[in-house]
């Protein structure tokens, strides 16, 4: 499961994951 920000899939990945404003990719 990959957690990433809608605006920047590669930036601050873990931070956005922890904050909760994330999008989840089933890949």
From Swiss-Prot:
Tissue/organ expression: Expressed by the venom gland.
Compartments reported by the entry: Secreted
Top-rank taxon: Eukaryota
Alphabetical UniProt keywords: Acetylcholine receptor inhibiting toxin, Ion channel impairing toxin, Neurotoxin, Postsynaptic neurotoxin, Secreted, Toxin
GO CC, any one term: extracellular region
Main location: secreted
Cysteine-cysteine disulfides: none
GO MF term (any one): toxin activity
Family, per entry: Belongs to the three-finger toxin family. Short-chain subfamily. Type I alpha-neurotoxin sub-subfamily.
Function description: Binds to muscle nicotinic acetylcholine receptor (nAChR) and inhibit acetylcholine from binding to the receptor, thereby impairing neuromuscular transmission.
Descriptive protein name: Weak neurotoxin E3
Organism: Micrurus pyrrhocryptus (Coral snake)
């Amino acid at each position: 499961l990959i957690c990433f920000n809608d605006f920047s899939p590669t930036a601050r990945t873990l931070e956005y994951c922890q904050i909760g404003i994330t999008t989840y990719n089933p890949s």
